[in-house]
Amino acid sequence: DFTHRRTVFFVDQKYFVIVDEALGKAEGTVNLHFGLAPVKMDVDTDKHIIRTVANSPRNIFLQCVSTDKAELKEEEGWFSEVYRKKEKRPAYSINIAKGEKPVRTVTLIYPEKKDDTVKFTAKIVKADDNRLEVRVSVNGEKKDLKWNITTNQ
């Protein structure tokens, strides 16, 4: 008895907020995997932050917030630009123990300018079978993101 539900919000055509929900009574470990571009990474395992550090005016900031204790781990990652030739690339996973209660994570993917400092917070306001409400703050700008399925039974 396990359901994975993912909601993707594209906020103001600027950044993505992804909400992953692991629902049901199944037990084990919930893993969110991130395969990234083959560039240098700056990783903060305590805050669950991954930043690309490319020789570019723009990079990617990724942070995952969870309702439960989570662990950010480096893992093996590969990519291929040519058939039958694979090369290593950075890959990470967020790992969370799953019991009977739901596990929910909120991930920000934000295009970051050089020398930016991104501040991100997220809170699940409501979540059930028919609705999701999440409140996020990115660099002090608050947004309420939600969906609601109305059923006529």
Regions found by a protein language model. Give the residues of each.
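CBM-like, beta-strand-rich accessory domains located in the C-terminal region of large
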Residues: 1-153
